């Protein structure tokens, strides 16, 4: 057995994203990065750079809304506007887009519209990371295994630092200790997890190179970052 992790990174592209890509390439860490359409329009070349460097880019909506707070039609528009931008980035990179993946902002799957969104994603060729080996009970309790969007089994929670909801020391403690008896533990127990991380300029301003500190910690603990396997 081993400690295996699929690394997923939300909210690209931002100013820090290119440096994160360089770190990932240097350390041979594969990753799936979920892009926000508005951010693609601001930093289009960064998305192209990520694709050229082996990053799989997925869809994270256009304006990052809570999908339970918008209509079904608005949600579809959020997805489709971003699809156009991602396809354009792959075309500019000169590489085929082999995977269509979507992650809901805040993992908010639409509330009473959830099944409508799930049907849309399935009917339009979206895929999910293979989650058949995840052991964290919490992942199954909320039904992530039954859905086609990409969720996660372990949330690093570093995005809480700029708002002072968590200190960086508390983030590192959470990283080292895991989510408790029924949750995921990516550093101390063998297993397989889909990990949620973020590319955030706000976090970089508070803790410069936060991504280096966190990912180095995982590498030093013997975590193996694996390529994502996809399924319909």
Which sequence ranges carry the predicted segments?
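Short beta-strand edge/turn micro-motifs at domain boundaries
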Residues: 131, 222-226
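C-terminal accessory extensions appended to soluble enzyme cores
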Residues: 210, 230-232
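Catalytic domains of cell-wall/extracellular-matrix polysaccharide-remodeling enzymes
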Residues: 41, 66-193, 201-218
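Residue-level preference for the first positions of well-ordered beta-strands
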Residues: 4-5, 192-194
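Conserved active-site loop/cleft motifs that coordinate metal ions or position small ligands
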Residues: 194-198, 227-228
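Short loop/turn segments at strand-loop or loop-helix junctions that form parts
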Residues: 60-62, 133, 198
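Active-site beta->alpha N-cap acidic-glycine motif
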Residues: 1-104, 110, 217, 224, ...
């Amino acid at each position: 057995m081993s400690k295996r992790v699929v690394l997923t990174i939300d909210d690209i592209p931002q100013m820090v994203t290119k440096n994160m890509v360089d770190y990932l390439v240097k350390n041979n860490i594969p990753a799936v990065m979920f892009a926000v359409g508005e951010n693609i329009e601001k930093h289009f070349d960064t998305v192209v750079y990520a694709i050229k460097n082996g990053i799989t880019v997925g869809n994270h909506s256009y304006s990052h809304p809570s999908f339970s707070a918008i209509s079904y039609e608005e949600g579809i528009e959020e997805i489709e506007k971003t699809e156009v931008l991602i396809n354009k980035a792959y075309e500019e990179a000169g590489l085929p887009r082999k995977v269509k993946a979507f992650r809901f902002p805040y993992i908010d799957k639409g509330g009473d519209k959830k099944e409508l969104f799930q049907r849309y994603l399935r009917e339009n060729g979206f895929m999910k990371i293979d989650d058949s080996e995840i052991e964290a009970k919490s992942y199954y309790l909320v039904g992530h295994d039954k859905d086609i969007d990409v969720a996660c089994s372990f949330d690093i929670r570093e995005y809480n630092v700029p708002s002072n909801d968590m200190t960086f020391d508390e983030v590192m403690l959470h990283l080292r200790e895991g989510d408790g008896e029924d949750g995921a533990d990516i550093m101390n127990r063998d297993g397989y997890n889909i990990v949620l991380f973020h590319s955030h300029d706000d976090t970089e301003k508070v803790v410069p190179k936060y991504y280096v500190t966190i990912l180095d910690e995982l590498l030093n603990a013997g975590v193996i970052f694996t390529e994502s396997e996809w399924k319909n």
